[in-house]
Amino acid sequence: MKSYQGLADKWIKGSGEEYLDINPADKDHVLAKIRLYTKDDVKEAINKAVAKFDEWSRTPAPKRGSILLKAGELMEQEAQEFALLMTLEEGKTLKDSMFEVTRSYNLLKFYGALAFKISGKTLPSADPNTRIFTVKEPLGVVALITPWNFPLSIPVWKLAPALAAGNTAVIKPATKTPLMVAKLVEVLSKAGLPEGVVNLVVGKGSEVGDTIVSDDNIAAVSFTGSTEVGKRIYKLVGNKNRMTRIQLELGGKNALYVDKSADLTLAAELAVRGGFGLTGQSCTATSRLIINKDVYTQFKQRLLERVKKWRVGPGTEDVDMGPVVDEGQFKKDLEYIEYGKNVGAKLIYGGNIIPGKGYFLEPTIFEGVTSDMRLFKEEIFGPVLSVTEAKDLDEAIRLVNAVDYGHTAGIVASDIKAINEFVSRVEAGVIKVNKPTVGLELQAPFGGFKNSGATTWKEMGEDALEFYLKEKTVYEGW
């Protein structure tokens, strides 16, 4: 069994309790034993970031960008190694892991290039002897708290713009996937990033995370995770002595609407890919299917035909879906399945544990799910799809919007009027037309509405860079 103990020992230097990083496809496979960070360890990491800020912020932006570009090249060269580690640590298929690694090294290159064009603007003055211009400057030390489901790309899409802008960082990945960020820090170091610019800490969010975001040395917090934790972080930041910028990317309960004008074969493909790809463990995953009554029966048949071909197993094999990430999430998924059975939803596919050494679960589909059921309203974060019938487009839009979340939403249709109506009325930060609800491009801004985000600062694209910069206005007279 492959061990990553050397990687852990080199980059994760906590002094707290021991944590076992386990392969979710094989519970007997320990990837590494990791020492979690204590509050004192976190304070030390923050102090290192503070001490390094002046040097790094004064490093010319093109030089900072060159380091990111180099890191992207190195990651590309080591892509296979990154992908294997991701599959072993998080559980996703090698194909999905390689896709994420590719996006990650392209993100490094994207923000490396953007560092060359950080600039302010010049404005006209009413006084002929005055020049007005603005200057963009880094914020200071930023705290980045990242989830386990995209254990490389989300850390990169936070860290790369933060570094390009000239900030130093304390980054806390999820305890389920710390090795991916350790590998990222290693690549940045090889690319020439000075020690202390990025400081990795690993530990429980209730202790380590709270310590980071509450520290008055932290100028900004970027968090991706559950809405519950996001709201708590929002309050912690608000109670600090220092005003702190905050960026939140939170939970989702995304719907795909199948219109009566839809290509039903395409719709079934998008539903299965969006609902069961990545084991349903994505904030943009399809969790709800809203089906126009005129095509309900035909679509259901296509859906069941497609899901029967969906292959589940270890991500290192030729499969479509890997294991659930760990025992806690596995139990949560099973609890929702039992709930669905008990409240009157009809289980039409799956719902069973797949025997083996990992946390394997069949893709699961319920129909007859009503808007008052928890299956309809709550984020599950697993391979569980709920199906609800809508009498027309108006009711479908009402159902899509009838949750507290607004990350992504999709429509499958050929009727342009229906498409435009859906796009204009649905409350979500990303709308997909004849595309799966999952899948984002790095050059486009991303962020959810309602309880899926703070709707203040977007991630990815050029927008993300602005979160990590402040603007100074200068009036220069003579």
Swiss-Prot record:
UniProt keywords, alphabetically: Arabinose catabolism, Carbohydrate metabolism, NADP, Oxidoreductase
Protein origin, superkingdom: Archaea
Enzyme class (EC, first level): oxidoreductase
Gene induction: Expression is highly induced during growth on D-arabinose. The promoter contains the conserved cis-regulatory element 5'-AACATGTT-3' ARA-box found in arabinose-induced genes.
Q: Name one Pfam family in it.
A: Aldedh
Active-site annotation: E249 (proton acceptor), C283 (nucleophile)
Ligand binding (NADP(+)): W148, N149, K172, P173, A174, T175, G225, S226, E379
Q: Which reaction does it catalyse?
A: 2,5-dioxopentanoate + NADP(+) + H2O = 2-oxoglutarate + NADPH + 2 H(+)
Q: Which InterPro entries match?
A: Ald_DH/histidinol_DH, Ald_DH_C, Ald_DH_CS_CYS, Ald_DH_CS_GLU, Ald_DH_N, Aldehyde_DH_dom
- Give the EC number: 1.2.1.26
Q: How is this protein's function tied to pH?
A: Optimum pH is 7.8.
Q: Which GO terms describe its molecular function?
A: 2,5-dioxovalerate dehydrogenase (NADP+) activity
Q: Which GO terms describe its biological process?
A: arabinose catabolic process
Spell out the CDD domains in the cross-references.
ALDH_KGSADH-YcbD
The reply to whether Calcium figures as a keyword in the UniProt entry is: no
The annotated subunit structure for this chain is: Homotetramer.
Q: Which family, according to the similarity comment?
A: Belongs to the aldehyde dehydrogenase family.
Q: What does this protein do?
A: 2,5-dioxopentanoate dehydrogenase involved in the degradation of pentoses such as D-arabinose or D-xylose, a major component of hemicelluloses such as xylan. Catalyzes the fifth reaction in the pentose utilization pathway through dehydratation of 2,5-dioxopentanoate into 2-oxoglutarate. Also shows dehydrogenase activity toward glycolaldehyde and DL-glyceraldehyde.
Q: What is this protein called?
A: 2,5-dioxopentanoate dehydrogenase
Tell me the gene name.
Answer: dopDH
